């Protein structure tokens, strides 16, 4: 009588139930390498998610019957997971067996740890919801897997994990009332935002327009001061002053909001922008330090409300209504002192260019921006001409006051009411003061037209004529102006000439070069599109294929920027090419067999990598077809669909067609006695369909290149380490081991059943 063991009642590899259903769970590890496989089995954790496992065809050795070679993955980050094929039961004849599902604590733990790692890495962006997502379908900076993962992970889990991890570090358990208040306020603040989010891009365009308004508004403060020819004095237009101060305050508020936005806006690390890829830095502390070390203090100086403080507080409180003359000098100093840094900071936005790319991409938009820049130069020159002309009128009145013989300095300010009516009437009739408003009364030079303009009551008229004068002088390089002997006037004329030359040399030349370069690229694209359209029309391709061809051409242009990297490498030294390829193709070492190879072999492989682009819904490999290349995904998402319908997603850093490497290595392998293993010339067949979910940038390695490398370095393949890695990572040997275990266990069950049957009959 055989003893009844408890473990014998529970089969180690039970027969799969035909009614069971499996679902393929997406791998969350970013370091895996998954490729094509045979009908897969799965291991199910307590969360009912399944782990998809793939298989490959046989690794042929000597004295083996011929088998059809199938494709499957070589490497996986999941270790110690049993692989097996579902075995149909006796009572399920004629019904296709379903993959078996088994509880696995390791799978559940690995899933949770992988998702937690993703959540911790991108917790700040995930908390922001839509503001943390990239809305650019042709983005070459943000990781394309982010949006999909962000949609799969619930916000509640993100918040809980983020709060438990970062709350103590950020707020020190909120021991003080200030920290508790900051902790409560932080819940209502927006999270870290993606620079490519739709809302952020809309704000950037709005901020660019507000920068244009801010640059135009500052010189307008000069037109608030005018001359009263009747009273021979200078005054401030206080009603218009309040309107200008309000507009300037609005632009300052917008700029302040943009400063606050920079502390919540993720940025792309420069060192990560390789092969079109980029890593978004979303840690709040790193973002704050990056901005503080950058242009924070310059932005803080620009946003300081100096004109508002002068007009609303300093002039009324200390100078009173008679402060027009002093206001002129203070405004000139404050506006010009703050205007130069503002131009340096805001002109890139005015040009439509930011660290994340162009704001206005069309040629006409850039043409309008360059035209507005030319208008800005005329606006600044005309405003300064009006201010300096007003200063020359003030100087003429001061000279007339010196010849007046009485204390009349206060009379130059219209708001002064301390002087008697008789003295003011005498000042009005002074011949020297009246001569200041005549053409030959004072050497005004280039400011002669500004004399009568300063006493015009209509502000729009004063500004329009000044703008016209500025345009005229920039366009003619001040060729029709002859300055007087006043040094300030001479230097101002020289500045106009230099600015005009600079605009023609840089702005006009830059606009011309930009239009020519843009036209050249557009011409190339237009010619290529025309050739493609003519070819498709000649071949009478259907509309669906034509649409895919157009999308492929567009994405290929967006991915390569019209630059052929192979042509760039041709004129570079060999060592420089090798170093560049080592830097670009670091993902090769994610494949386990490649990680065991020496650098010379990897360099030979890197030289043979070719850049490929695929559009969404493109088929990379199909079931029953030959596996002719290995594809390394750089950006985008693919999915591998098995024969049983299981779906396996592939992201950046993954590889499809990796079994091709083992197939080529086996063809170059040797037996322990040193003889070469004979392999048939038939190619490797794929058992899965691999298609693109999104647009994909990748590098491919053809089977001919792999065979070339293995033939060149065949000596290296005799290493026991490489041979062991080939057999360890081979899905065929794993499949064979799983089958042997299943056969042995079924044999043991039958023996136990035979031993238990006589005992049961005897007991009855």
UniProtKB/Swiss-Prot annotation:
One GO term of the biological process aspect: response to nematode
Compositional bias ranges of the Low complexity kind: 19-33
Ranges in coiled-coil conformation: none
GO MF entries: calmodulin binding; cAMP binding; cGMP binding; monoatomic ion channel activity
Intervals, Stromal compartment: 26-204, 264-295, 351-366, 510-764
Keyword field contains Chloroplast: yes
Entries under Gene3D superfamilies matching the protein: 1.10.287.70, Helix hairpin bin (1.10.287.630), Jelly Rolls (2.60.120.10)
PROSITE patterns on file: CNMP_BINDING_3
Assigned keywords, A-Z: Calmodulin-binding, cAMP, cAMP-binding, cGMP, cGMP-binding, Chloroplast, Ion channel, Ion transport, Ligand-gated ion channel, Membrane, Nucleotide-binding, Plastid, Thylakoid, Transit peptide, Transmembrane, Transmembrane helix, Transport
Residues reported in the UniProt entry to bind a nucleoside 3',5'-cyclic phosphate: 593-710
Membrane topology qualifier: Multi-pass membrane protein
Ranges that cross the membrane: 205-225, 243-263, 296-316, 330-350, 367-387, 489-509
Region (Calmodulin-binding): 713-729
Pfam families in the cross-refs: Ion_trans (PF00520)
Plastid among keywords: yes
Record-stated family: Belongs to the cyclic nucleotide-gated cation channel (TC 1.A.1.5) family.
Assembly description: Homotetramer or heterotetramer.
Protein name: Probable cyclic nucleotide-gated ion channel 20, chloroplastic
Organism from which the protein derives: Arabidopsis thaliana (Mouse-ear cress)
Recorded name of the encoding gene: CNGC20
């Amino acid at each position: 009588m055989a003893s009844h063991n408890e473990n014998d009642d529970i089969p180690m590899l039970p027969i799969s139930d035909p009614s069971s259903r499996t679902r393929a769970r997406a791998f969350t590890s970013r370091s895996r390498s998954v490729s094509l496989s045979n009908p897969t089995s799965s291991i199910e954790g307590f969360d009912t998610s399944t782990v998809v496992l793939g298989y490959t065809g046989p690794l042929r050795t000597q004295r083996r019957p011929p088998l059809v070679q199938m494709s499957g993955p070589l490497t996986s980050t999941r270790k110690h997971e049993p692989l097996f094929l579902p075995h149909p039961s006796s009572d399920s004849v004629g019904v296709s067996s379903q993959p078996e599902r088994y509880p696995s604590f390791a799978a559940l733990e690995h899933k949770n740890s992988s998702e937690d790692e993703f959540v911790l890495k991108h917790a700040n962006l995930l908390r922001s919801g839509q503001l943390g997502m990239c809305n650019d379908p042709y983005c070459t900076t943000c990781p394309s897997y982010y949006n999909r993962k962000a949609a799969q992970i619930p916000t509640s889990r993100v918040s809980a994990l983020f709060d438990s991890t970062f709350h103590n570090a950020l707020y020190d358990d909120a021991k003080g009332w200030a920290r508790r208040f900051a902790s409560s306020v932080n819940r209502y603040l927006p999270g870290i935002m993606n620079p490519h989010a739709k809302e952020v891009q809309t704000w950037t365009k709005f901020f660019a327009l507000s920068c244009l308004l801010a640059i135009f508004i500052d010189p307008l403060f000069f037109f608030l001061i005018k001359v009263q020819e009747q009273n021979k004095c200078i005054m401030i237009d206080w009603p218009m002053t309040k309107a200008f101060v309000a507009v300037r305050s609005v632009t300052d508020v917008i700029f302040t909001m943009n400063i606050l936005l920079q502390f919540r806006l993720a940025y792309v690390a420069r060192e990560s922008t390789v092969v079109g890829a980029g890593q978004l830095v979303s840690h709040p502390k790193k973002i704050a330090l990056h901005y503080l070390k950058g242009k924070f203090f310059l932005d803080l100086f620009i946003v300081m409300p100096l004109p508002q403080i002068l007009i609303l507080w300093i002039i009324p409180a200390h100078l009173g209504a008679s402060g027009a003359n002093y206001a002129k000098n203070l405004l000139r100093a404050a506006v010009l002192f703050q205007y130069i840094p503002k131009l340096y900071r805001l002109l890139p936005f005015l040009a439509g260019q930011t660290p994340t790319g162009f704001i206005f991409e069309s040629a006409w938009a850039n043409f309008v921006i360059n035209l507005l820049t030319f208008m800005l130069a005329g606006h600044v020159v005309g405003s300064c001409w009006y201010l300096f002309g007003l200063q020359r009128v003030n100087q003429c009145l001061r000279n007339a006051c010196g010849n007046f013989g009485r204390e009349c300095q206060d009379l130059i300010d219209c708001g002064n009411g301390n002087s008697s009516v008789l003295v003011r009437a005498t000042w009005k009739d002074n011949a020297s003061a009246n001569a200041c408003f005549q053409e030959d009364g004072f050497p005004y030079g280039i400011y002669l037209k500004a004399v009568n303009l300063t006493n015009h009551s209509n502000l729009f008229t004063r500004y329009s004529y000044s703008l016209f004068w500025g345009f005229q002088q920039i366009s003619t390089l001040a060729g029709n102006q002859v300055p007087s002997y006043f040094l300030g006037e001479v230097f101002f004329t020289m500045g106009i000439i230099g600015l005009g030359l600079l605009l023609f040399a840089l702005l006009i030349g830059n606009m011309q070069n930009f239009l020519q370069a843009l036209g050249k690229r557009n011409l190339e694209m237009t010619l290529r599109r025309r050739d493609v359209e003519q070819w498709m029309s000649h071949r009478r391709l259907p509309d669906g294929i034509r649409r895919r061809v157009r999308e492929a051409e567009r994405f290929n242009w967006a991915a390569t920027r019209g630059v052929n990297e192979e042509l760039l490498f041709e004129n570079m030294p060999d060592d420089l090419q090798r170093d560049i390829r080592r830097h670009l193709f670091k993902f090769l070492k994610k494949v386990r067999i490649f990680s065991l190879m020496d650098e010379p072999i990897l360099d030979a492989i890197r030289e043979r990598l070719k850049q490929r682009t695929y559009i969404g819904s493109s088929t990379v490999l199909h079931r029953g077809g030959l596996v002719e290349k290995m594809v390394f995904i750089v950006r985008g998402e693919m999915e591998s669909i098995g024969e049983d319908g299981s779906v396996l997603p592939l992201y950046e850093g993954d590889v499809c067609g990796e079994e091709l490497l083992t197939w080529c290595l086996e063809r170059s392998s040797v037996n322990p006695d040193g003889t070469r293993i004979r392999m048939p010339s038939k190619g490797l067949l794929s058992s899965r369909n691999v298609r693109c979910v999104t647009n994909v940038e990748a590098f491919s390695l053809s089977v001919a290149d792999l065979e070339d490398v293995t033939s060149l370095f065949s000596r290296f393949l005799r290493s026991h380490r490489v041979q062991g890695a080939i057999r360890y990572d081979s899905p065929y040997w794993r499949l064979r081991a799983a089958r042997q275990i299943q056969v042995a266990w079924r044999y043991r069950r039958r023996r136990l059943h035979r031993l238990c049957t006589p005992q049961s009959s005897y007991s009855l």
